[in-house]
Amino acid sequence: MKDREAISELIAASARQLSREHYNDAQIEAAIAHVFGVDSNLIEDGSYFVAESSDGLIGCGGWSRRKNLFGGDQYSARDAGYLDPQSEPARIRAFFIHPAHARKGIARAILSRCETEAQTHGFRALELMATLPGIAFYESCGFRKIGDYDLELTVDVKLELVPMRKEMRHPQITQITQTEKT
């Protein structure tokens, strides 16, 4: 995929700039090396989206019907098996926004597209693994924390993450009309 290198660069820039208040340099660099990265399954499944502007790629994110909750191709603990939409939540995956375009509605637009597509495929709930800088955004979109998770990246480096969940409403109403008198 031609966007793969640009997505990788966006992920690294986003992690390095937007995570500084929550993680130290060792955590950020280890996360980029071992976890944060392009997930080929999302691209192959057609469920990974990019936002573009005249500046190039400014955001990316996706959803998945696969069991893997987080991690790019380089992450060793991946599970590419499929979820059952009747009993398991779809996954929200790999959201990264270019630092120059953060907090401008890009992630919200991508998330809205992901929610709609997951619902279209029969899913009734969503789960994700949030980094600390993403928690407030996901809470503002209706997700709630369901635990805590410390990911061991190296012998000396751990990354605090937060699993989150959202129950989806019924498909949105597209039109309400007045009934005619008979």
Features from the language model and the residues they span:
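Active-site beta-strand termini and strand-to-loop segments that position acidic
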Residues: 52-54, 166-167
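C-terminal "cap" of GNAT-fold acetyltransferases
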Residues: 124, 129-135, 141, 147-176
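Short, intrinsically disordered C-terminal tails of secreted or membrane-associated proteins
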Residues: 180-181
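A short beta-loop-alpha structural element at the N-terminal edge
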Residues: 1-9
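Conserved GNAT-fold acetyl-CoA-binding loop/helix
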Residues: 12-38
